[in-house]
C-alpha cells in the first residue's frame, strides 16, 4: 500500500449544493465541475481538490442502465416516484441522490499513478478515519453487496449492510475518486425506487448486461448504523477533521471554475449526451 497522495498536502475545498430544480443544466453542474477540475489538473500543478456536492430527488443512471429493453417505462416509474433521471457519462449503475445523501469527490494529480484498488483503499481509509465509532461495530468493510443498487467491489459496509459506493475516473495522471454516502433519510425507499425502475425497465427480460435484483434492506444510513444523528454538515466537518489528521492544510478554492469557458464546454457536453 503506497502513501496516500493527499497526506501533508494543501487541500482546496469546493462545495456544490443544488436545490430541487427542473433545470437540466443545474442538475448536471456537479458532474461538469468534476470534469473541469480533472482537466484543470492535467494542465496545472494544482490540487488536490475535495468537492462536496448534493442533489435533490435525482436518480443518477449509468450508461449501462440506458441499455434496458423498456427504458421509457423505467423512466416513467422514476418520475412517478418523484425523482428526475439523469445519465452520468461513466460506468456503474443507478444511484439515488436526495436529501441525506452526500457525494464527495477527491481529485488529485500523481505522476506515479496508483492502481485502481489503491485509490479505492485510500477512500475507504479516509472514510474510516472520519467515522472512528464504526470500529466498535467491526469497522467499515469493503466488498460487493450484490443485492444493493450499483453494486461494486468497493462498496463500503457496516455489519454487512452498505452505506456507500465508490467510483473512479482517470485522465492522464489525474485521478478522481468519488463516493456517495447515505447519511440519513429513508434509505429503504431509495432502494425501492431503484428496484421499481429495474422492474419496469426490464419486465423480466434477459439481457447481456447484469442488473441487480435490489433488496432495499441491503443498505442503510451511516447515522442509523452508528446510532448517531448526523447532518450533511456534520459529515463534512468529520471529513475535514480527517484531512487535518493526515497533516493536510485546508483552504477554500478561490477560482470560480463554474464561470470558466472550460466548465461551460463540459456542461454543454453533458447536456448533449442526456
State the predicted function of each range.
Residues 141-163, 260:
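Beta-rich nucleic-acid/ligand-interaction surfaces
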Amino acid at each position: 500500500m503506497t502513501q496516500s497522495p493527499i497526506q501533508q498536502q494543501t487541500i482546496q475545498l469546493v462545495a456544490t449544493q443544488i436545490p430541487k430544480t427542473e433545470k437540466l443544466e443545474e442538475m448536471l453542474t456537479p458532474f461538469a465541475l468534476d470534469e473541469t477540475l480533472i482537466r484543470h489538473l492535467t494542465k496545472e500543478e494544482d490540487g488536490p481538490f475535495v468537492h462536496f456536492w448534493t442533489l435533490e430527488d435525482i436518480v443518477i443512471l449509468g450508461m449501462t442502465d440506458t441499455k434496458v429493453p423498456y427504458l421509457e417505462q423505467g423512466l416513467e416509474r422514476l418520475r412517478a416516484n418523484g425523482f428526475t433521471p439523469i445519465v452520468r457519462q461513466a460506468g456503474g449503475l443507478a444511484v439515488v441522490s436526495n436529501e441525506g445523501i452526500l457525494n464527495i469527490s477527491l481529485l488529485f494529480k500523481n505522476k506515479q499513478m496508483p492502481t485502481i484498488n489503491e485509490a479505492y483503499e485510500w477512500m475507504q481509509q479516509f472514510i474510516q478515519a472520519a467515522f472512528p465509532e464504526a470500529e466498535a461495530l467491526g469497522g467499515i468493510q469493503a466488498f460487493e453487496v450484490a443485492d444493493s443498487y450499483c453494486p461494486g467491489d468497493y462498496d463500503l459496509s457496516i455489519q454487512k449492510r452498505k452505506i456507500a459506493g465508490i467510483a473512479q475516473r482517470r485522465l492522464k495522471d489525474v485521478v478522481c475518486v468519488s463516493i456517495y454516502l447515505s447519511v440519513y433519510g429513508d434509505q429503504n425507499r431509495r432502494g425501492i425506487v431503484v428496484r421499481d425502475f429495474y422492474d419496469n425497465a426490464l419486465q423480466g427480460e434477459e439481457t447481456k448486461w447484469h442488473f441487480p435484483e435490489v433488496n432495499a434492506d441491503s443498505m442503510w444510513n451511516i447515522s442509523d448504523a452508528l446510532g448517531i444523528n448526523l447532518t450533511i454538515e456534520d459529515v463534512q466537518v468529520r471529513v475535514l477533521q480527517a484531512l487535518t489528521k493526515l497533516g493536510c492544510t485546508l483552504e477554500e478554492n478561490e477560482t470560480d471554475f463554474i464561470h470558466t469557458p472550460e466548465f461551460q464546454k463540459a456542461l454543454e457536453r453533458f447536456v448533449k449526451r442526456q
